[in-house]
Each structure stands twice: as structure tokens, then as C-alpha cells.
Amino acid sequence: MAARLLSLYGRCLSAAGAMRGLPAARVRWESSRAVIAPSGVEKKRQREPTMQWQEDPEPEDENVYAKNPDFHGYDSDPVVDVWNMRAVFFFGFSIVLVFGTTFVAYVPDYRMQEWARREAERLVKYREVNGLPIMESNYFDPSKIQLPEDD
């Protein structure tokens, strides 16, 4: 088990060294002794790059902060940038926050919780007035339920 792990780690280290161009000797573990074999990486010759490095023909991006120190990131034109920023903040804060919170505040009875409470109070009053028990074990009247016949 240990020999396998050492062999695996040795291969990983030699591969990492080969990627960096470092000379490495291959180490192979057999039973309790190490055998050093010549590296296969040393025999391989480095390939010359086929394409020469060229500068990017596109000019560098212009610095928009030099042209507009109050750049907000919406447009390179300063006037359009300011108008877009104002529109985003108007709709983001005025419309969404103000009208959104107003809508949430006036949303009718979420999940009908208030209605359920009022309905329960109404049923309790009805049962007390008519002398019925407040709660019954059967939701439906068992005499009205028709069950299928046993075969």
C-alpha cells in the first residue's frame, strides 16, 4: 500500500517538475528498495513555438475616468451616463422601494389567516348559541358518509 502511494506521489512530483522544465529522475518503488531509472523527460526535446508573439493590433481601452471623473459605469458619454444613473436610482429607489413597501403593507390577508380566525370565532359562537359541542371528533357527519360494500 505504501509503495503504491509513494509511486503515485513520485509520478505526480515528476510530472509537476517536467511541466516547469526541471530535470528529474524517475523513482520506482519495488518492495522495500528504491530503483532510480533515467527520466523520460530528459530525452524529449523542447518544441520551438510555431507562432511568433505579436502585439495586439487593437489599441488599449481608453480611460473613461480621464474623460469623465464622475463615471458611473452606464455609458462612456458623460451626459448619457448621468441620465442613466438618475433613471436607475429613480426607478430603483422611488418606484421599487416606495411602491413596493406600500403594496406589501396593503396586501390583503396573506394566506387567509385573518379570515380563518374570524371564521373559527363565528363557528364557536354559533355552536354555543345552539348548544352544540364546540369541537367534534368527526369533521363530517358519519351517518351521511356512504362507504363501499365489503366484497
Swiss-Prot record:
Localization of this protein = Mitochondrion inner membrane
Protein's job: Accessory subunit of the mitochondrial membrane respiratory chain NADH dehydrogenase (Complex I), that is believed not to be involved in catalysis. Complex I functions in the transfer of electrons from NADH to the respiratory chain. The immediate electron acceptor for the enzyme is believed to be ubiquinone.
**GO annotation terms (biological process):** aerobic respiration; proton motive force-driven mitochondrial ATP synthesis
Coiled coil start-end? none
Keyword annotations of the record: Electron transport, Membrane, Mitochondrion, Mitochondrion inner membrane, Respiratory chain, Transit peptide, Transmembrane, Transmembrane helix, Transport
Q: Which family does it belong to?
A: Belongs to the complex I NDUFB11 subunit family.
Q: Key word Transmembrane helix present in the record?
A: yes
Quaternary assembly: Complex I is composed of 45 different subunits. Interacts with BCAP31.
- TM ranges are 87-107
Q: Does the keyword Iron apply?
A: no
Membrane protein topology class = Single-pass membrane protein
Q: What is this protein called?
A: NADH dehydrogenase [ubiquinone] 1 beta subcomplex subunit 11, mitochondrial
Mind telling me which PANTHER family this protein's record contains? Answer: NADH DEHYDROGENASE [UBIQUINONE] 1 BETA SUBCOMPLEX SUBUNIT 11, MITOCHONDRIAL, NADH-UBIQUINONE OXIDOREDUCTASE ESSS SUBUNIT, MITOCHONDRIAL PRECURSOR
- Please give the superkingdom of this protein's source: Eukaryota
